[in-house]
Amino acid sequence: MTTQKNIAPLYWGGLFIGILLSLIYAQHQWVMADQLQMLEKGYLGARAGIWLNYGNVASAMGNVPGSLSAWLVGVPLLLWDSPYSPMLLLLALRLLAFVLLDRVVRELFSPTVRLAFMLFFWLSPWFLYDSLLYNPAYLPLFAALHFWSAFQLREKGAFWSSFVCSALHVLAIGMAMQLHYSWPLLAVISGYLFLMGRIRFNWFGILAGVALVGLSLWPYLHETMINSSISREANPDAQARYIGWGLVHVYPIFKALIYWLRYSSWIFTTKLVNGVEFSAFAAVPWLHWLLIALWKVVIYAVGAASLWLVILANRYGWTQVRASLWRRRREQAETPRTWFALYGAAAVMSVIVCAALAPIVFSYWHLTLVFPFALFPLLLWLEHWSLGREHKVRRYLLWAACYCIAVNLVAAHDSRKFAYGYDYAGQVNLYLQQHPVLKLHPASQE
């Protein structure tokens, strides 16, 4: 049997490589509109003392409520006035997301599956491709906090433990709300778990969490009273959309479910796949064309094979939950691993519900909150399949890790959002020079 000691070098090596890849992505990001919105809010707060009470402009819904995005960028700048300070905080929060998820995976699964989770989550190009300063990049932390707190609340515990976990559960939803309008994904999961008796809240903790979220949103609510434009989309086409638009048009639901399968496969976002141009070889046309062709053939061939495994895994996951999905917990015994599988099933339901209600067609970043949960069926299937095959599985995982590292290195240096010629700090400093209001005030230099 594989022990924790056997996988320790591979585990810590993978963790370290993931950190290095995150730093490479961060350094070579192309600073565009979403990052500039975050930076503007942070620098206004840190340098001008103006803390905006609303977040980034969202698709068809106006600005995201709350000032969390300003604080996430501005507070690190107060501690260290460098473009790298908010970026380092972001990467640290993403590492914390992995740690929270890993604590539960370590408790429920074998060391081999834990190693697989590190690969599928921490080294996945789906995850690392978001190592840039924009609001969806923070969402894995709140997804992880939501899942971790729910796992702690599956049984009735001590008062203070359940109080803290209940408050954190609400805060996970409330803080996600202040970064992206995809927060209902978490709310639907919580609703299912509560209605089916699979989560036992401490109501004092719930009230405390609601109070904290309410206090953090109060300045935004006051702002909407005097500036209603921040709560609605100015684009007439977007205004024509309505709640339930996805259900009427059906395709948005289908596309969202495809993303659920793609997240745990290696059919990566087209921004990564089709954005790679191997521009360093543009001077040699035949080699340039050959590299692009080989890249796409390999990516789509490996992606198709991985998608087949993902479909098998989701089918296996369905067999684990179909008898329990609509039965309240008190009607039957339930193991922690069954609870884990049901949480994943709840995530699928949340994708369907939110895609049906949303006034837009989801892109991959709209569903970032469920990316970790899309891996759950794969972990369940791998735990079943790897019995007696641990050494073979570890060899497969090593090859898979090499593949993911190679894809990440290419994407971090030559894709639609990243390129070896981009310098993150240089772009930010140029932006600051072009916007005098964000320049360092003399008083803050003393």
Listing of model-derived features with the role each one plays in the protein:
Residues 188-306:
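Transmembrane-lumen/periplasm boundary regions of multi-pass, lipid-linked membrane glycan transferases
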Residues 129, 139, 185, 338-389:
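Hydrophobic/aromatic-rich transmembrane helices and adjacent perimembrane loops
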Residues 67-71, 79-96, 132-133, 288-297, ...:
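Loop-to-helix entry region of an early transmembrane alpha helix in multi-pass inner-membrane enzymes
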